[in-house]
Design a protein with these regions (language model features):
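PDZ/PDZ-like peptide-tail recognition elements
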Residues: 64, 75-114
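Short acidic, Pro/Gly- and aromatic-enriched capping/linker segments at domain boundaries
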Residues: 324-336
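Cleft-lining beta-strand/loop regions that shape enzyme active-site pockets
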Residues: 25-37, 46-53, 57-58, 111-114, ...
């Protein structure tokens, strides 16, 4: 598909979304309004087919329109053709090698939510906010997120070619990453003076038990305070984030989910699952997502912990694959996770009560760092000095 035709598809799909969502303003009482908008959609489709300067690929137009609708509503949604959906189901249960990227759709293209610590992608220099213009020379502009994830998988030792855009770059940088088996980092614990430091870089099943074991070990070593480092905690089931919060929180609401057709479901802390009452500081960054930010939101809202760092990524939703008549499928967010005080974590993230810039200023008078949470980071993001200052601030933060 040439660039001019891509533009037509994108513009067309955006117009369709506007018509379907907002075309009924002023006549919303009419039950026929949505069908009127579909009539306009059909008319636009016929005009493209009849009048466009070149003979259009109508299948591409339709797929582009569907992707445009989904992206406008939910950047994490995907439309998969029947063949793509079969591949998706097969890939879900496979143990193929990977490059270790967590992806999301931002700015119309795929972007990096996180590079799993120790993965080939992290070693290749990927960081949160990198915009991926292409994967294996295929543009990600109209690529469903679920399909992009499939392209990352393959046989160990084979390469994936990326076109990556960063701040101050006018052309995509070509990066080749070799697939390997992904080993998710184990939970680690250490003493720093009288403070126990626990690092969690992912919440794969079993990690919460590891955290509980580290808490017990650190308390035996005389810990009077705990620091829970959730930077780059972006993988694993969301439910693990709820279980993680419950280790520190013995009462009250942890989170709840709610969707248009999903009834509100509350998750309360259970006293029997809490394992410590020590003062707590949690560190987060832009790569903290899913269960990590669910736990962070709960511990901050309940005043169980202070939160230090950057605003988290903002990806905490329940997604469901809906199969269509022709065997294709739509993957949609059907419910969002909310903080106990009612703030949606999805797209908003969790804002610390001590931001990174404050931590750096506390470490060195006159240090200047605007560090806007939603700016696209450049190659200097997440370098060791900034990370060290966050840890120093967490270690010295007075109890509330």
């Amino acid at each position: 598909m040439n660039r001019r035709f891509q533009f037509v598809v994108v513009a067309f799909s955006s117009a369709v979304v506007a018509l379907l969502l907002f075309g009924a303003v002023g006549r919303s009482a009419s039950p026929d309004a949505p069908y009127t908008n579909l009539g306009v959609y059909s008319e636009v489709l016929s005009r493209i087919k009849a009048d466009y300067v070149e003979e259009p690929d109508m299948k591409a137009v339709t797929v582009g329109a569907i992707n445009g609708m989904l992206e406008s509503l939910d950047p994490h949604a995907s439309y998969l053709t029947a063949d793509q959906y079969k591949q998706y189901l097969k890939a879900k249960d496979s143990k193929k090698a990977d490059v270790g990227l967590v992806l999301a759709k931002r700015f119309g293209y795929m972007s990096v939510e996180d590079a799993i610590p120790g993965s080939p992608a992290e070693k290749a220099g990927f960081s949160t906010g990198d915009v991926i213009e292409s994967i294996n020379n295929v543009s990600t502009r109209d690529m469903p997120p679920a399909f992009a994830e499939q392209l990352l998988q393959g046989d160990a030792g084979t390469a994936v070619e990326f076109g990556v855009l960063r701040v101050a770059q006018t052309e995509a940088k070509k990066i080749s990453v070799v697939r390997a088996s992904i080993v998710y980092p184990a939970v680690t614990g250490r003493m720093d003076g009288q403070t126990g430091v626990i690092q969690v870089q992912g919440l794969m099943p079993g990690r919460v038990k590891e955290v509980a074991a580290q808490i017990a070990a650190l308390e035996k070593q005389g810990a009077k305070k705990l620091v829970l480092d959730l930077r780059h905690c972006s993988t694993g089931p969301d439910e693990e984030g709820i279980a993680l919060a419950n280790l520190f929180q013995d009462r009250g609401l942890i989170t709840y989910t709610l969707g248009q057709k999903s009834a509100k479901q509350e998750f309360e802390a259970q006293a029997s699952k809490a394992v410590t009452k020590l003062p707590l500081v949690v560190i987060v960054n832009r790569s903290t997502a899913h269960g990590g930010e669910i736990a962070a939101a709960s511990l901050l809202s309940s005043k169980r912990a202070q939160l230090v760092g950057e605003r988290t990524y903002g990806d905490a939703a329940i997604r469901k694959a809906v199969t269509l008549a022709d065997g294709s499928a739509v993957i949609l967010s059907v419910a969002k996770y909310y903080s106990p005080e009612g703030k949606s974590i999805q797209d908003n993230g969790v804002t610390p009560n001590v931001m990174q810039a404050e931590a750096e200023l506390a470490a060195a008078d006159g240090a200047a760092d605007d560090n806007l949470p939603d700016a696209v980071p450049d190659d200097t993001t997440d370098k060791k000095p900034a990370a060290d200052e966050l840890m120093k601030r967490a270690l010295t933060l007075p109890e509330k």
